[in-house]
Amino acid sequence: MSQAEFDKAAEEVKRLKTQPTDEEMLFIYSHFKQATVGDVNTDRPGLLDLKGKAKWDSWNKLKGTSKESAMKTYVEKVDELKKKYGI
């Protein structure tokens, strides 16, 4: 998986004709963060930040996943979403 393919997918996901589901967005977010930052490096958001907690939890589940693996899974998911929602 090349950085160029990953960067292209990151741009394409912003142009989907229909907004993906929350679950799909969490998947995309967590794999993007794992590919670009690595393991979660922040404290878990507070009790009242439901969206922040969901994003953090989704990313934290990928702890230990390699950058390459996260990039590959991210690109595959974006390709799936492009077929499902169109660009």
Curated annotation (Swiss-Prot):
Pfam families tied to this protein: ACBP
Modification type N6-malonyllysine: residues: 55
Keywords associated with the record: Acetylation, Endoplasmic reticulum, Golgi apparatus, Hydroxylation, Lipid-binding, Phosphoprotein, Transport
Molecular-function GO terms, alphabetical: fatty-acyl-CoA binding
Subcellular location: Endoplasmic reticulum; Golgi apparatus
GO terms under cellular component: endoplasmic reticulum; extracellular space; Golgi apparatus; mitochondrion; synaptic vesicle
Keyword Heme: no
Main location per the UniProt record: endoplasmic reticulum
Domain ACB residues, every copy: 2-87
Cystine bridges: none
Function per UniProt: Binds medium- and long-chain acyl-CoA esters with very high affinity and may function as an intracellular carrier of acyl-CoA esters. It is also able to displace diazepam from the benzodiazepine (BZD) recognition site located on the GABA type A receptor. It is therefore possible that this protein also acts as a neuropeptide to modulate the action of the GABA receptor.
Subunit structure, as described in the record: Monomer.
Family statement: Belongs to the ACBP family.
Protein name as annotated: Acyl-CoA-binding protein
